Amino acid sequence: MERHPASASSRQELGRLLEAVLTSRGQANAVFDILAVLQSEEPEEIEEGVRTCSRLFGTLLEREELFVGSLPSEDTALAGSQGATYKYKVWIRHRYHSCCNRLEELLAHPTFQVKELALKTLMKFVQLEGAKPLEKPQWESHYLFPRTLFRAVVGGLLTPEDDHSLLISHFCEYLEYDDIRYHTMQVATSIMARATSQQPEVSLTLWNNAFTLLSAVSLPLQECELTNFYVKHAQTSDKWKVVHLKEHKKAFQEMWLGFLKHKLPLSLYKKVLVAMHDSILPHLAQPTLMIDFLTSACDVGGAISLLALNGLFILIHKHNLEYPDFYQKLYGLLDPSIFHVKYRARFFHLADLFLSSSHLPAYLVAAFAKRLARLALTAPPEALLMVLPLICNLLRRHPACRVMVHRPQGPELDADPYDPTEKDPARSRALESCLWELQTLQQHYHPEVSKAASVINQVLSVPEVSIAPLLELTAYEIFEQDLKKKMPESVPLEFIPAKGLLGRQDDLCTQFFCLS
């Protein structure tokens, strides 16, 4: 939709009203005319009204002309016997509240420029109201933050009606401030809890908005004093929770646990699990509290289970969590479809990581090597070029499994003891089998696959082959590589020159036949 700037006359009128209110309290009623512009149906006029309100109440907050303390009702204050200054401050603070309420409504305006300007103005008021509090401190050095106003801002972002992902991305610029980040986590936790308590079925839009905001919150990894505040204070106190990283971690943990305890759509499950290992677990006060969520996700199956294993592995490896079924879950994910899923590269990267320990029992590694080899028989070439080096790496790490490569007294192929239907790798009898699948793949039609499968015909080198460059290999890339191969300038031909069709020396045909 085409936008037209507000007319010069309307800007001049708003400027005149602004100057009148700031110059003389006798002209205070002009505030109503300024606030009325916020109700306009023209986005350009609303923007001018928001800018005017920003300058007006920003100046009044700096001048400390708003009532401080528990705000009485407007009628009670005006009917009382207090002085004119008291009544004016109460009255102007009520107008300030009316302005903030309207700005909160504008966060849902259909025009993004209006929403963005309303957000910036509200955050400006948060900063000014924090520097010049509208409530009296309960004790000396009491930490004051405009929680009520800030809750309205975050509440305007986490709504079930509108997708605010773009507006939230602009709000995320404020999350670099320690106090904004801390209070955002607290307020978001409260809003999500209230939304789910009021209605059993929460809209997908609210969950998407919540995830967009939550995933943007990041904490420092190292313990440090937090002093980068959006609301400036003359001096900070060690008694304030907002200055301690451990309190931020507690708030971060409560926020995510409050989000993940609800039934989420599969699309959000995947997004959360993708971010779990590097954006969520490192910042939790007690990472092991995620075990219930991750084990439940592991039981879902498919890509959800695949992504949940990474978080479980971190809990096992770094936090000494016991989860005996981990490798059985991983083994169960190995089926023919794994070569065609969206997260194939991520899965095999993680599988390589999970199987990297040299302390794993030989029977377990043998089961994975055998399952991968069996799946390789029907895998596409781009997957084979990744899987075959992975199998060889498993044999390099675990010499006890190399018996599977060459077993002179092994069973016939039709009597392979390996049971591909067994879900428990310990009972699959893979170590009694052999990797005949790799010898079969040496006859593959693609020369690179045949070459990769032929590596087991020789002594395996000590250094492993990195599969990282092969994880995201595609059929298109293989085709392009084949096209770019340079052929030798001279093609090798027969070394004895031909003299006619039957012209070779000692050719029996020339002795008994004559072509004439």
Curated annotation (Swiss-Prot):
Gene Ontology annotations of biological process type: ribosome biogenesis
Topology relative to the membrane: Multi-pass membrane protein
Keywords: Membrane, Nucleus, Transmembrane, Transmembrane helix
UniProt xrefs under Pfam families: CBF
RNA-binding is among the record's keywords: no
First-listed, main subcellular location of the protein, grouped into a coarse class: nucleus
Residue stretches spanning the membrane: 296-316, 347-367, 375-395
Compartments in which it is found: Nucleus membrane; Nucleus, Nucleolus
GO cellular component annotations of the record: nuclear membrane; nucleolus; nucleoplasm
Superkingdom as given in the UniProt entry: Eukaryota
Family per record: Belongs to the CBF/MAK21 family.
Protein name per Swiss-Prot or TrEMBL: Nucleolar complex protein 4 homolog
Annotated source species: Mus musculus
Name of the coding gene: Noc4l
